[in-house]
Amino acid sequence: MKSVYIISVVLFFFTSCSRHVKNECLFQMNHVEDRKIMLSELIDSVEYVPLETVESSLLPALSKLLYVRDFIYASADMEIMKFDNKGKFIGKLSEFGNGPQDYLNINDYDIVLRDSEVEIWVCHQKGISRYNAEDFSFLGLISLDIPVLHFKYVSDDAIIIQTSGEHSFCLCDKNGVVRNEFLSNDPANLSHSLMQFIETEDGIFCILANTDEALYYNKQSEGLELIHYVGGIDNVLTRDDNRAYMERYGYLEHPQKVAQDFVNIVTFRKKGNCSMFFLRSGKGEKVLINKNGDDEWESYDIYPNPTIENDLLTGLDVRYLLTMSSCDSDDAFMMSIPAHMLAGALVNGKVIDAEDNPILIKYQLTN
């Protein structure tokens, strides 16, 4: 596809917004109520998972973390670490080099479930390399003629690629054959977060640079669509705003200016009927929560004057909720706390050292 088609499509009980006709969105925030609450009243089923710290498992302060089928995976420079569901270090993928099964860099990775097999896929300058998640053996290379910045596996016939080529996105198959291309390259509206793709039961989102638009893979229709995925947020950043500010202020000043003048959608997660959105503007940061899949939302300030009192990890700024943006779990909400923020605390019978690996916190929202 050489041009972008803007369509609206029925998605179960939701109707998406097209580029020009703004109907109901996948997430509609018509009714938002500001509240105050204790953190323990907001989340439950809390599980703390300190990731084991040994010389061969050291992680950077910021790492992409995935919890899939009771195992935890974490990116660390040129390696992918693997831990069990208690945080015990199991092993790592480490194939840096020039050989046919090696990679010279890791732009992104994903944990891919193919039938009964679990694989680690890594994208780099040569394409996407596949490895067995059990023994880290090399399974093959998907060669691509375009640079792969980020990717998300959907099926053998559908791999979403974010690229710096002529188009921003494309859809290819397991053989590297490009099926469709989307969005002419638009630097102002491309982000490069650790967790670039967000998966829900119905589809996969790639938020376009903190705006109200996303490239959306609809699992029902098996196609990519450009949609306004959220509605009801006043002064929300749009792609047009983003582009205009880039042209006006330039590459360096642009992010600060749009963060000051608009409401930016930092990230979101949806588990079952429960959704959490994190918003940032010149006035501060908020989390919006929905527990029933309707248009009734609860709004809580998390900075600078939080309306959530942290009674679970006393003394820790509730802004740590935002670490959800770098991690995801297949069965719960999850966040990642740098060890230095919990130094001296007793977690699962262990005193946390400032130099330890991050501590994962899995949780559900209260009913």
Give the residues covered by each predicted segment.
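Repeated scaffold domains used in trafficking and secretory/extracellular systems
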Residues: 60-64, 103-110, 146-154, 189-197, ...
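Loop/turn-rich, solvent-exposed surfaces of beta-rich toroidal or solenoidal domains
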Residues: 257-306
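Conserved blade-ending motifs and adjacent loop-strand segments that build the rim/top face
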Residues: 230-240, 294-328, 343
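Short coil/turn segments at the loop-to-beta-strand junctions that recur within blades
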Residues: 55, 94-102, 143-149, 184-190, ...
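C-terminal motif of bacterial Sec signal peptides marking the signal peptidase cleavage site
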Residues: 15-16
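A short helix->beta-strand "capping" segment at the edge of beta-propeller domains
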Residues: 33-59
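Blade-loop segments of beta-propeller domains
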Residues: 52-56, 89-116
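Short beta-strand elements that form the blades of beta-propeller/WD-repeat-like
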Residues: 71-76, 110, 117-123, 157-164, ...
